[in-house]
């Protein structure tokens, strides 16, 4: 089975970070190519929140890419198969002026054609490019995927990251409860 990388529904809106776009953009992350940067990606949050509760999550949302905690990053970095497929980029998180280190951003290094276009519902993102990028209102994943993988970027919708049963099982075994598998 294939699952979309999705945060738990109880992730509060007040925990959405702002992605500081400097040398790496969200578009760069959608290319499935290794990125070389000396500087970490920066995420900021300036709201009155419970920092302890916020930092109890393992995956976080932003107006750019999602990013993961030091705990989840360490678990994944120790998985040799996973790090062959996904680059983990350094990220610094700034919460109300206080910097936190050790966070990572997923950069899947390959695309996977995985959307069943007959069962999914989409429309062209640009009306003058009917065969170009699509905006999906309903995504149905193909059931005939035989490729052995951990995480990939969806070829038909590059903003979508998909994960495999292997990664789902890894998360369950390591008590990662912030990711919804649907």
Question: Model segments located where?
Answer:
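Phosphate/anion-contacting hairpin/loop surfaces
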Residues: 1-182
